[in-house]
Amino acid sequence: MALKTDIRGMIWRYPDYFIVGREQCREFARAVKCDHPAFFSEEAAADLGYDALVAPLTFVTILAKYVQLDFFRHVDVGMETMQIVQVDQRFVFHKPVLAGDKLWARMDIHSVDERFGADIVVTRNLCTNDDGELVMEAYTTLMGQQGDGSARLKWDKESGQVIRTA
């Protein structure tokens, strides 16, 4: 099935910036079980040459989620977001993310293919700091399938996840 909107080559700029919070860094580190002292202590971060807490490597997924939600709120691709799953992701880090950083995000639709009745979309996601320096780039592969209902999914409020029901 083809996507309703031709998104190939589209560039989506998130309309706002994201400020990395000191306590967000700590909370995220605890949540993903990262125990390096530079995530919790300014002194430990300073020992590594940084002037603020360092965020765990996957911290930028918080901003990435905002960008994807904003994209799907504004671009009608012709399917519900519950029918879209992330099948791959690769990160390329250029600079550490520090507490207090002001980050900007852009999502480029790198490729769109149709295989076996599913749409495969690869995005290149760029995260820059307030000086315009590239902090991180990620390549994300999403798969969406419009429905014959063969993959029955629903939102489970208790677990906070999308689950397969059949």
UniProtKB/Swiss-Prot annotation:
InterPro entries per record: FAS1-like_DH_region, HadA-like, HotDog_dom_sf, UPF0336/Enoyl-CoA_hydratase
What GO biological process terms are annotated to this protein in UniProt?
fatty acid biosynthetic process; fatty acid elongation; long-chain fatty acid biosynthetic process
Task: Provide one Gene Ontology cellular component.
Answer: plasma membrane
The molecular function terms in GO held by this entry are: (3R)-hydroxyacyl-[acyl-carrier-protein] dehydratase activity
Q: Which SUPFAM superfamilies match?
A: Thioesterase/thiol ester dehydrase-isomerase
> Where do the coiled-coil regions begin and end?
none
Write down the Pfam families for this protein, in alphabetical order. FAS1_DH_region (PF13452)
Q: Which family does it belong to?
A: Belongs to the UPF0336 family.
Return the HAMAP family for the record: UPF0336
Listed PANTHER family: HYDROXYACYL-THIOESTER DEHYDRATASE TYPE 2, MITOCHONDRIAL (PTHR43437:SF3), HYDROXYACYL-THIOESTER DEHYDRATASE TYPE 2, MITOCHONDRIAL-RELATED (PTHR43437)
* Name of this protein: UPF0336 protein Rv0637
Species, as recorded: Mycobacterium tuberculosis (strain ATCC 25618 / H37Rv)
